[in-house]
UniProtKB/Swiss-Prot annotation:
GO CC entries: cytosol
Alphabetical keyword list: Lyase
Taxonomic lineage of the native organism: Bacteria, Bacillati, Bacillota, Clostridia, Natranaerobiales
Domain MGS-like: 1-120
Protein name stated in the entry: Methylglyoxal synthase
Task of the protein: Catalyzes the formation of methylglyoxal from dihydroxyacetone phosphate.
GO biological process: methylglyoxal biosynthetic process
Positions annotated as active site in the UniProt record: 60
Residues annotated for substrate binding in this entry: 8, 12, 54-55, 87
Pfam families: MGS
Family, per entry: Belongs to the methylglyoxal synthase family.
Coiled-coil region list: none
E.C. no: 4.2.3.3
């Protein structure tokens, strides 16, 4: 499976903890991420991660393009719902493209754990 990993700044440490917990599962899949999320994962795990631009610089749109062309099967997008994001339209577009292409997307840990435990 091809999995995209994205996290807002206030969720990056939590995502890293989640990824470390399931590193043995994620290691068998192809991973991509926005730049700073991917760098954090690469520096703190043994996982290989293809990195796109940071979200505000177009990374969300790059991953959206990968979804639209059939190159992503799952998205883990841990959003910070309590902090306004300057690139909110890009985030909305990414979630929309997931819906258009019927791509499962986890925006919180409960959903992410269900996906990992039941599908991956």
């Amino acid at each position: 499976m091809r999995i995209a990993l994205i996290a807002h700044d206030n969720k990056k440490d939590e995502l890293l903890h989640f990824i470390k917990r399931y590193e043995h599962v994620l290691a068998t899949h192809t991973l991509c991420a926005t730049n700073s999320t991917g760098r954090l994962i690469a520096e703190n795990t043994n996982l290989m991660v293809h990195r796109y631009q940071s979200g505000p610089l177009g990374g969300d749109q790059q991953i959206g393009s990968e979804i639209a062309t059939g190159n992503v099967d799952f998205v883990f997008f841990l959003r910070d719902p309590l902090t306004a994001q300057p690139h909110e339209p890009d985030i909305t577009a990414l979630l929309r493209i997931c819906d258009v292409h019927n791509i499962p997307v986890a925006t919180n840990f409960a959903t992410a754990e269900i996906l990992v435990e039941s599908v991956l």
